[in-house]
Amino acid sequence: MVKHYEVVEFDIKNKKVLSPRQSLTSDQEKALNSLPAIYVYRSSRTKQIYVGQTIHFKTRHNQHYDGNEEKFEEAKFDEVIVLFFERANGSSLDDIENQLITFFKADNPRNKPYKIINGTGGNEVTVYTDIEFIAYNVILPFWDDYLFTNGWAKDKQTKLRESALVKYSPLKTLTEDQSDLISRVVSDKKHNYVINGDAGTGKTVLLTHMVAELMKDKSKRICVIVQSNWEKTANEIFGIYGMKRNNLVVTTSTKFIKDAQQGEVFYDAVLIDESHRLFRDYRKGIASSWVGIYEGEFSQCKSHLEIIQKAVGSKGQIILMYDVLQSVRPSSITREMFADCTKDYKKEFLKTQFRIKTPVGKSYSSDDYINGIKYLLFKDTGLLESGYTQFDPNFNRDVFRDLSPDAYFGYFTDSPLTNAYQWIRTKGIYNPSDSNRVLAGYVEPWKMADGKDSSIKHWHEGDIHLRWNSSQEGWLNSTDADADEQIGSVYAVQGIGLMSRFSTN
């Protein structure tokens, strides 16, 4: 395989002297003094790593050790590698530096075994011409074939990409539309916003970037409200990327309200992820943690959102991530209540980032597939005309009529469970690195407690007997012996990015 990058290795002796591990060619000598490069320092003594970029490495190395950078003196680096690569320019340097910092931090959770001492995540990155070339010909092979092989990394990039620390990193590359949207919202402090986006449009990634942008002003107090099953992950994400400071609070809606009941809360900005899942005053089967929520000054409120709005008042900006098409529990805020609460908010829309591989000779696209699924599920609900989601009624129906072996969409009418299960097993044979799952709607009785007992089966068809997902959190990466024989419920995959889905009924 042709390599599109080269690595030059140095030991660092006498605190700062570069000692090449191989004889340098004249081209390498020239490159070290005049070409764009990425470099990574590492200390075997203090267990620290630093990632940087430059257009003249030797000059930059001397600058690091000129006595003005205390962290370099304390780190006691004893080696450095310099990466040269094709199509090097300002954009690709920013991209590689950004992604290496992200991957190193995900590879060293809680700064163990190595601490990444970069003060920031590098420069902001937007989509550029060579982004795919750099991703597949430089970043991926450099990480897997060099860093992983030579002990600089514990895990390969494919595994790290499944980590929430990478998926929702505030360092991920943004599209130009996403970057512009963040600028509009952050600069317009006089208005509250609803960021509308279907599943897979990058609402959570946008939220982490927006928090990073807001926190550039260290005088601002920021509150991020997330679902309870994501609170720990969100704290880890903001913590590992150096954003967990006294002016940032990550909490749940119920905890926020209880704090508000104890006294005045003041935030310059309150961002709420998955605001379609905020609770309403639904007393049936009310959780014990809700006791006292809809009382006192909040006794007339009908939802957690209404309480949050009242607590924040006009002092702070509220930014809501919303998907009108998602509604999981009867205790969630209704669409009508949400619309009423946000009637004076400005609305923004995210475009889908979903992509499909169109078979040769076919003309349908990912947009046709998404519009078709929306039409199938919501055509009689009025939601497609609500103004909260983007929908094209003139989508190409061929995506659902294609019967070729490589068709993107398919369904079974005979023995659907058996055929769906066999289908993912076959996919696994030809794609051994993939993790394939069968998902389903509420077709069979479901109890969370059943997940602890692998002998309890819920799905039966012929000789096949399968069970619902064993856990709610982290199910896609479950290590259960029968993980790929479990049927995933909506609760197991809610808010999780999926590469592909096959649901059976």
Give, region by region, the residue ranges found by the protein language model:
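Signature of the SF2 helicase/ATPase Hel1-core->accessory helical subdomain module
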Residues: 272-353
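Conserved short loop/helix modules at catalytic or binding sites
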Residues: 26-28, 55-99
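Hydrophobic positions on the alpha1 helix immediately C-terminal to the Walker A/P-loop
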Residues: 206, 210
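N-terminal pre-P-loop "Q-motif" helix
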Residues: 166-191
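GIY-YIG nuclease catalytic motif and its immediate N-terminal context
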Residues: 1-55, 59, 91
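Core RecA-like ATPase module of SF1/SF2 helicases and allied nucleic-acid translocases
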Residues: 201, 239-253, 257-269, 343-505
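AAA+/P-loop NTPase substrate/partner-engagement loops
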Residues: 217-241, 251-260
